[in-house]
């Protein structure tokens, strides 16, 4: 979910982190995934130099650097204003421990660190608003809570939903509807866990929340990504959601699709790649990605 946003005269880097799923089908990451991790990490650090403000929505290692990654900490946070999830409240024990480590490492690098839960900031003519802590998925989730981000300047507005999983928490939906953004980046429900970690009823409730967000906001483009892209069959499982978006003439697509690329399901393909049944060219894919985004970044810098 690492996202670079340029709005007005400022650039924000949201959740500068990357990680792999440790086990899938009883298998660890393939060499292809390890290469993708390496290239993603380098790209995140490369683009982070463009940002004046870094944002951390919660303390999972796919959203901020691992504790031993001093290089990533320095390149992502040095001399920046850091707006982060409060590590002392509305947070589980694991989050408190990770947040304390994050604070100890980033505070000596950052220009300043502000706990951002339920706060508003005016930065260079950009209004930045953070939600109160909402659940990482359904209410009561064992993995804790996150904060969402809304940015607005003039007629432009963007909402980044962090790991809210189809806006499963009703308070997450309420905040999204209140902000009524023109562009949304949302985390989809982890459908790979249906039937064992996640109940079908929870999925159906979350879909109703997502439908309302699509119907009742001005957003004409909604990027739906992250947890849901772990499932190759996510479009079939969310068919009613995609049909609704199409009926409303709204674009609902993954981050890769937003840039005109095919989805690259490396984790879901882990078994096939491990068996030699599927070959992938990770470096070529990342070159294609860079060819898409680098001109946009350079234009923004100009």
Q: Which sequence ranges carry the predicted segments?
A:
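A short helix->loop->beta-strand "cap" motif at the edges of active sites that frequently abuts
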Residues: 10-11, 77-82, 216-222, 247-250
């Amino acid at each position: 979910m690492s996202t670079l946003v340029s709005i007005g005269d400022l650039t924000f880097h949201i959740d500068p982190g990357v990680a792999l799923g440790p086990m899938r089908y009883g298998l660890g990451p393939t060499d292809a995934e390890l290469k993708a991790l390496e290239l993603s990490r380098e790209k995140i650090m490369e683009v982070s130099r463009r940002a004046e403000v870094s944002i951390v929505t919660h303390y999972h290692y796919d959203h901020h650097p691992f504790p031993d990654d001093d290089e990533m900490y320095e390149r992502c946070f040095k001399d920046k204003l850091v707006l982060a999830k409060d590590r002392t409240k509305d947070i589980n024990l694991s989050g408190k421990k990770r947040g304390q480590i994050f604070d100890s490492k980033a505070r000596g690098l950052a220009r300043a660190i502000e706990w951002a839960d339920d706060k508003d900031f005016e930065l260079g003519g950009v209004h930045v608003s953070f939600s109160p802590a909402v659940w990482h998925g359904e209410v009561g989730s064992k993995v804790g809570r996150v904060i969402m981000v809304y940015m607005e300047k003039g007629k432009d507005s963007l909402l980044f939903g962090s790991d809210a999983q189809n806006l499963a928490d009703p308070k997450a939906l309420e905040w999204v509807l209140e902000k009524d953004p023109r562009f949304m980046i949302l985390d989809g429900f982890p459908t790979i866990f249906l039937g064992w970690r996640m109940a079908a009823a929870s999925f159906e409730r979350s879909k109703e929340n997502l439908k309302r967000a699509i119907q009742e906001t001005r957003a004409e483009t909604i990027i739906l990504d992250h947890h849901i892209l772990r499932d190759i069959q996510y479009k079939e499982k969310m068919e009613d959601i995609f049909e609704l978006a199409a009926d409303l003439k709204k674009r609902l697509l993954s981050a890769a699709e937003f840039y005109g690329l095919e989805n690259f399901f490396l984790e879901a393909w882990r078994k096939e790649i491990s068996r030699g049944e599927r070959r992938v060219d990770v470096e070529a894919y990342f070159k294609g990605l860079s060819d898409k985004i680098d001109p946009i970044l350079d234009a923004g810098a100009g």
